[in-house]
């Protein structure tokens, strides 16, 4: 695998996405796809994540974020290219 095969994205998910297990859902998706990064709630009600790994795995994570867990209602997903995280693994962070 070359660096060209690695994608790093900042993902912001809006809608009814807090209080429904959204962060745990994304942690599970990241672990299944062997991705690095983090996820956290935002004070404005959104959920944001930094995710990095093989492009196809990142695409699968974004697809999961677009759907969300049962009980969530996603109204918008914003993607921005990003630098990869400094730590390996995927963490659930405190609200920002």
What is the meaning of each model-derived region?
Residues 1-96:
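Intrinsically disordered, low-complexity, mixed-charge
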């Amino acid at each position: 695998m070359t660096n060209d095969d690695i994608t790093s994205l900042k993902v912001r998910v809006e809608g009814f996405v807090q209080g429904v297990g959204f962060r745990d859902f994304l942690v599970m998706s990241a672990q299944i796809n062997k991705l690095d990064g983090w996820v956290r709630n935002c004070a404005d009600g959104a959920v944001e994540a930094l995710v990095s790994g093989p492009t196809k795995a990142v695409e699968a994570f974004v697809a999961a974020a677009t759907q969300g867990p049962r009980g969530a209602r996603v109204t918008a997903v914003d993607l921005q290219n990003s630098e990869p995280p400094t730590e390996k693994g995927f963490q659930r962070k405190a609200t920002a």
